[in-house]
């Protein structure tokens, strides 16, 4: 698979332009996208206008719709905020840390026959500027800001975009399908009824 000749992005805007070039292709080179996102050095001046926090839960803030090929968003995690265990609806998911630390816990898909709880398969702590990747063939994950003193900010790319996902109960393995919404779009708060969701990851 051919790789686009890319320069290291100096700004978030540069990164977005290069992502648009890469996603003109019908196929996706996971390593290329991950390397590109990792090569961007986080600069709060680039992304602060998109970083909208909520006191009670983490937020999803849309940055770019990627001509329908991908969604790029910034997630803001207050102290102790975390996601449910969830899938990614057959999409590629790239997660780059812009500020703070996030703990990612991986899980295998639950065995429907056993009706048993879900045991963590592995954990890692993402540091600033690191990038992680997951898709449904690799399993499920939960993301948490375990700090009680520092917020965290992460940049997520989903391709193709999706509007719902499945969240899982760790004790039973049962799942629910939930609709996801944006707390803000392009730096502007979305109407309240459009931004409330059961699970906003």
Curated annotation (Swiss-Prot):
Q: Return one GO MF term.
A: nickel cation binding
**Annotated crosslink 3'-(S-cysteinyl)-tyrosine (Cys-Tyr) location:** 93-158
* Swiss-Prot/TrEMBL GO biological process terms: L-cysteine catabolic process; taurine biosynthetic process
Superkingdom of source: Eukaryota
CDD domains this protein is in? cupin_CDO
Q: Please give the function described in this protein's UniProt entry.
A: Catalyzes the oxidation of cysteine to cysteine sulfinic acid with addition of molecular dioxygen.
Q: What is this protein called?
A: Cysteine dioxygenase type 1
Q: What is the species listed in this Swiss-Prot or TrEMBL entry?
A: Danio rerio
